[in-house]
């Protein structure tokens, strides 16, 4: 997964295409705009999250260039942030015969560039955009992208899934089933007992969510129309019990199976990504959790 606004689009497209070739066409590309301002301003000043509209324009243009690089033998681009090739650059080399495919043969000025190799998958690997708000969800559907969602409750996710389904159905002129093109990320820790899961991982996930919610608040954790009591500090309500009932796959194998089945029955969930190595988790405990998930959850 890449925060594409932080990267040169031609370099990123080339790296992904090469990886797709090396993996024999098994790459799936995750993309996002970024959520942390201190990263954005240091990686690419044009991606500064203080200007969300500009950040989105950069995101859109970057993705456009990547798709051109993957799908066109030679391509050019002139946009707000990038121009390819660089204007007025001439090229002459005895071992590189001039071609009208990419060169003005009268002036030797390069008119187009290319990325080699192209991806193994054609026209390009599947693209998954991390989304949250309705506008981003609709944009992804309208532009042929799959989506990745993370925190919301089942009730809140239902609305998001429906927005994506409706926009994708309209864009593709077909009845898209609920759940198609959506992948859900859930924080997961499996243990022998509910108490052990909380003891080994509870405070670590709370600490991590406090980090995330410092910027985002608790809104993404709430059901539609839910109102929380006022507190002195915005994160006073954020504890294990608050999180567990809303969006955690923390508990016994049986409990986790039941929660996944709920996601399938309510959302027709087709793609689940589990996040199990969040900050603070003991490595052995994490690996034990993954083994329990593999042995006692996946088969059911």
Residue locations for each model-derived region?
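A conserved active-site cap/scaffold subdomain adjacent to cofactor or substrate pockets
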Residues: 130-156, 160-161
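An alpha-helical appendage that flanks or caps ligand/catalytic pockets
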Residues: 52-118, 155-269
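Short, acidic/polar
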Residues: 15, 131-138, 255-262
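Short glycine/threonine-rich loop-to-helix capping motif typified by GTGT followed
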Residues: 190-195, 282-292
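Glycine-rich anion/phosphate-binding loops
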Residues: 4-21, 250-258
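Structural preference for beta-strand elements that scaffold enzyme active sites
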Residues: 26-30, 126-128, 146-148, 179-183, ...
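Conserved, mostly hydrophobic/aromatic
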Residues: 19, 66, 127, 140, ...
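Glycine-rich, proline-tolerant flexible connector loops at the mouths of alpha/beta enzymes
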Residues: 3, 35, 151-154, 275-286
């Amino acid at each position: 997964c890449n925060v594409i606004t932080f990267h040169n689009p031609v370099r990123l497209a080339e790296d992904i295409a090469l990886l797709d070739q090396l993996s024999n066409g098994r790459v799936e590309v995750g993309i996002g705009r970024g959520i942390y301002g201190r990263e954005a301003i240091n990686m690419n000043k044009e991606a500064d999250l203080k200007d969300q509209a500009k950040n989105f324009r950069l995101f859109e243009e970057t993705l456009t260039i990547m798709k051109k690089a993957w799908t066109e033998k030679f391509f050019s681009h002139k946009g707000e942030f990038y121009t390819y090739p660089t204007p007025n650059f001439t090229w002459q080399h005895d071992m590189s015969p001039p071609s009208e495919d990419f060169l003005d043969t009268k002036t030797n000025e390069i008119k187009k560039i290319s990325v080699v190799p192209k991806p193994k998958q054609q026209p390009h690997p599947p693209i998954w955009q991390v989304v949250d708000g309705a506008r981003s969800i609709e944009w992804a559907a309208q532009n042929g992208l799959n989506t990745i969602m993370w925190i919301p409750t089942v009730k809140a996710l239902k609305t998001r899934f429906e927005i994506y389904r409706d926009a994708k159905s309209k864009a593709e002129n077909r009845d898209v089933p609920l759940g198609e093109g959506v992948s859900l990320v859930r924080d997961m820790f499996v243990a022998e007992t509910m108490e052990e899961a909380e003891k080994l991982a509870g405070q670590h996930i709370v600490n991590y969510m406090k980090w995330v919610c410092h910027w985002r608040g608790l809104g993404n954790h709430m059901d539609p129309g839910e109102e929380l009591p006022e507190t002195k500090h915005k994160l006073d309500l954020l504890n294990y019990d608050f999180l567990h009932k809303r969006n955690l796959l923390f508990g016994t194998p049986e409990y986790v199976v039941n929660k996944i089945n709920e996601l399938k029955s309510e959302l027709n969930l087709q793609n689940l990504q589990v996040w199990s190595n969040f900050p603070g988790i003991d490595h052995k405990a994490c690996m034990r959790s993954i083994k329990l998930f593999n042995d006692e959850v996946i088969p059911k």
